[in-house]
Amino acid sequence: MNELESLKKKIIYRSAYRGTKEMDLLLTSFVSSIINTLSHIELRKLDIFLNCNDEDISNFYLNKIPITTFDDAKILNLLSCHKIK
């Protein structure tokens, strides 16, 4: 397994096992919709994003409250536009 595949597997796993079912559903859906469209650098940023706590991610997604610990505009824009199917 190469580094890119390993990183993708890590991201998929971390998006699916967050701590709350709501975050599991949101982030699993979000990650699966974008993971194959991101560059290696963007995947690293997504991995960093997944270090943010669930409350910050939820507040950003639902209320558009900025996440002070993460500032990548592309990832945040993709999340804000994401709709769970």
Enumerate the language-model features and the residues they cover.
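Positively charged, polar, low-complexity stretches
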Residues: 2-43, 47-85
